Structure formats: structure tokens, C-alpha cells
């Protein structure tokens, strides 16, 4: 087993996991702010003013649906942050992280992409490919972590 390679692989996994964790913390803040904004729309005085606008997207039902979607995205961000933290902590100690953590992180990310597509299609605004620039970057980073993990696992198996 080449300890330099193990250190290098652990460093890559740790740094990318830290970056993804920070990205998810930003997502948590954004979702909380979005929830606050949506909650403001449910205040009776605001509802009275929205009734004069006659916008079909500003009904209580649509606002409630938006809140539900934001809550799901918030929970996804919280869960992903915990996963990336655990992966990063294992890598920091140069201990091979549990492979299931990577599988969970990839699964949660795939689920969030499906949720985003469904949300876009149900919103009536249509499909916008530009909304997937950052998810594509995150997918690339997750793939990089997974490939690095595989190399790290092979190096540890050489003992």
C-alpha cells in the first residue's frame, strides 16, 4: 500500500466533501429564506392584496405546494450536509469512509434532481435547462469523489 497515494486520495475526498457540505449549507440558508418568503404570502393581509391581483399561481393551494417542495429540499440539504460531513471526517482521519455513505449521497442527489424536474414541470413555467448547471457541477464532483474512493479502496486492499 502506497501511503502517499492514500493521503492524496483522502485529501481529495476530504476537500470535495467539504465543498459539497458548504454548498448544502448555502442551500439550507436559501431554503429557509424561501420558506420565510412563502410563509409571508399566507398572512391574511397579504392574501387580501393577492386576491386583487388575480394571479392563478398565487392561490393558497399553490403557495402550500411551494412550501411543501421547499421543505423537502430543505430536508434533502440537511441530510446531504450530514452525509458529506461524515465522509469528510473519515477522510480527514485517513480512514476509508463507509461506501454506503457515498451511495446515500448519490441517491439523495439523484432524488433532488428528480424533484427539481417535477417541480419545474408542475409549476407551469416549463423546463429550463439553465437550472441544471449547478446540479451538473455537483454531479461531476460526486463522480470525482466516487472514482477517487474506488482508487483509495484498491490501494488499501493492496495491504
Protein language model annotation of sequence segments:
Residues 65-83, 135-139:
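Generic alpha-helical transmembrane segments
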Residues 27, 107-151:
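Alpha-helical membrane-associated segments of multi-pass integral membrane proteins
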Residues 37-51, 85-91, 150:
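Membrane-helix exit/juxtamembrane interface segments
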Residues 50-58, 121-127:
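Membrane-interface interhelical loops and short amphipathic "cap" helices
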Residues 81-100, 139-159:
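Cytosolic juxtamembrane helix at the C-terminal end of the final transmembrane segment
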Residues 54-73, 111, 115, 130:
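Transmembrane alpha-helix entry/boundary detector in multi-pass membrane proteins
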Residues 24, 97-104:
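Membrane-interfacial loop-to-transmembrane alpha-helix junctions, especially the N-terminal start
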Residues 1-44, 56-64:
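Cytosolic juxtamembrane helix and N-cap/initiation of the first transmembrane helix
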